[in-house]
């Protein structure tokens, strides 16, 4: 039985890790984990060990909000590096979170660790900080990419497919689409996804609540499961139906308003027309504009940009995020163009990410 040290700091990283572990267990049998991950995985996979740190301790977004975690991250890196020598570890899997995983890989190399290191979900060097490329390539043995264009930037990356195509179990078909078009406005289900972090929710929910008054049909507020006991941050949500399974919410929704993040790509792949709305601290936006050189911030639109396609969905940022703009975008939505690009995205990204990564883990 193999033992892996994993670093999955974000909620999305743990969702991806869960699918990888399912694929590994199905194809190769039992395993053990050490590192940073969601405690729920211990029960689900009947693990004997517990995480050194819970992933919830490291969740943050923005240049300012991450600062308090720096000292904790340094402590965790030191402890994880020591753990790699005191436990029999077959492989180290780092998922996303470059601000943590790159320093961790450096610490491992400096300590003389010979354990194979895999980086899954590579840093977005195509957006900013391309100078990280040689550092990443020299500190990781395998670069498991989920983006078809990563190989334009990394010399030794291997594209293994996009994890969302494995994780989403139901996609809209033509019958679903026709059913949406046959509905009157007061029969439509509208989903609101204001993000998972407290700061995102506080900025978007007042606008989403006011916007929801424009719709007479069913209104769903998608709340991540780990936020279900913290509903006070959303304010008065009595007019919404609360659900937490994002793909299922998107499957039943006729339209969605979504904070920037993984959910925008989920909506595109499921086939739910949506508008992206994002508000951040002014200082975060200022810093981002200095370094990030992209036309769009939504993942689906970024993929379309790299493929030479027009944007898939409208995006509204900062002061442009208001009820008037969002409702107008809903009323003027180009559904035909949206669905055409959805088909392209599925073909572009491919399936099989979890199974392919499980195979890599078994071979190291």
From Swiss-Prot:
Enzyme Commission numbers on file: 2.4.1.182
Pathway: Bacterial outer membrane biogenesis; LPS lipid A biosynthesis
One of the GO BP terms on file: lipid A biosynthetic process
Molecular-function GO terms, alphabetical: lipid-A-disaccharide synthase activity; phospholipid binding
Catalytic activity as recorded in UniProt: a lipid X + a UDP-2-N,3-O-bis[(3R)-3-hydroxyacyl]-alpha-D-glucosamine = a lipid A disaccharide + UDP + H(+)
Enzyme class: transferase
Keyword line: Glycosyltransferase, Lipid A biosynthesis, Lipid biosynthesis, Lipid metabolism, Transferase
Protein name per the record: Lipid-A-disaccharide synthase
